[in-house]
C-alpha cells in the first residue's frame, strides 16, 4: 500500500515535518496571514521581502515586515538587495533568534525593484549572485536559500543557481 504522507524536508539543520512552505508574497504574508497558514498546515513560513538597504538605513517600514510569533517556527526572513556588503551586514543584524533561515529574493519582477538591479535583475549577473550569497552565508550560521525565477533566457536559471550553489560551498 502506498503512503500519502509527505516526507520531511531538511534544509541545513532545520527539519520541516510538513514540507509545505508558504511562499513570500509582498503585501500578503504578514504575521496574521502566516499564522493562519500555519494553522492550516503550512510547515514553514516566510516573511514578505524586506529591503536590505531599508534595514541598513533604518527605514521604519521594515520592522513591521519582520514581526514574528513563536507559533510559526520555522520562519525565514526574505531579504533583497544588490550590495553584498550591506546584504551581509543586514543578514547579521536579523540573526537575532526570530528567524531560522534567510531567503534571498532573486525573483521579484516588479519594475522598481528590477530598475535598482535587485530581485530578478540579479539573474543577469551571476558574479553578483555569487557575491550576495557568499556575503550572506559568511555573516550567519543559519541556512540560506535563494528564490529565483525561470529566467530571462534558456541559460539564465542555470547560471544563477550554479553561482548560488558555489557561494554556499
List each language-model region with its residue ranges.
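Flavin-dependent oxidoreductase catalytic cores
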Residues: 1-161
Amino acid at each position: 500500500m502506498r503512503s500519502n504522507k509527505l516526507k520531511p524536508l531538511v534544509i541545513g539543520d532545520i527539519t520541516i515535518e510538513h514540507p509545505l512552505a508558504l511562499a513570500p508574497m509582498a503585501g500578503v504574508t504578514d504575521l496574521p496571514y502566516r499564522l493562519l497558514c500555519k494553522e492550516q498546515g503550512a510547515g514553514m513560513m516566510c516573511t514578505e521581502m524586506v529591503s536590505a538597504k531599508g534595514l541598513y538605513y533604518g527605514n521604519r517600514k521594515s520592522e513591521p515586515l519582520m514581526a514574528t510569533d513563536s507559533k510559526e517556527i520555522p520562519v525565514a526572513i526574505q531579504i533583497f538587495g544588490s550590495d553584498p556588503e550591506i546584504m551581509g551586514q543586514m543578514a547579521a543584524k536579523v540573526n537575532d533568534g526570530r528567524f531560522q533561515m534567510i531567503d534571498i529574493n532573486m525573483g521579484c519582477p516588479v519594475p522598481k525593484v528590477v530598475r535598482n538591479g535587485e530581485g530578478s535583475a540579479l539573474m543577469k549577473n551571476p558574479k553578483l549572485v555569487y557575491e550576495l550569497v557568499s556575503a550572506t552565508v559568511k555573516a550567519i550560521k543559519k541556512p540560506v536559500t535563494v528564490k529565483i525565477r525561470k529566467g530571462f533566457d534558456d541559460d539564465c536559471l542555470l547560471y544563477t543557481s550554479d553561482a548560488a550553489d558555489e557561494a554556499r560551498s
